[in-house]
Amino acid sequence: MGTYAIQLAKRSNIHPIIAVAGKAQEHVQSMLDASKGDAIVDYRKGDEAVVQGIKDALQGRKLLHAFDATAASNSVLNLCKVVDTEDDARITLVLGPEGDVGGQHTEIPTSVQQSLSNVFDVHGTQAELGYVYSRYFTRGLQEGWFRPQKQEECAGGLEGVEDALKKLKDGSASATKFVFKIADTPGAGSSR
């Protein structure tokens, strides 16, 4: 999700983009523009390094807008340490707190506006927005300014799920979406 947010921010000329990534740094770096202040911070170096990396990338500017595409580990807490608490800052997250997917993160200061944004919204109250986005993404794909993540087709259809899960678990897959062709599953489509 983060790579899509980066592409939309770039398209809107929103800079600097300060991205936090791990093994996918090379992929993320290819989307950033250092001449506009964009930077990448490695989350594998720990929370203190993430906070300091964001501060360094800000170069004294205030952080007023943040999009947390993971809401994992301490990402919300790290953002709370760098987001400005006095000037109408906003954090958008893709997940609520653990155990309360649609809830509010209590660790975010009350002076900072928080909102949740996820795909479920387009199946309800945001259906019209979902339609517009789908058309806009299609246009971006056609024009080349919007790119999908790298995909890897897994051999054997659904029999390839185990291998894909192993790659995710051992960390050998990063910034990759796995594709399983159901028709390639042994026995698929046959009647018994």
PLM features: what roles do these ranges have?
Residues M1-R192:
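Terminal helix/beta-alpha structural elements that buttress the NAD(P)+-binding lobe
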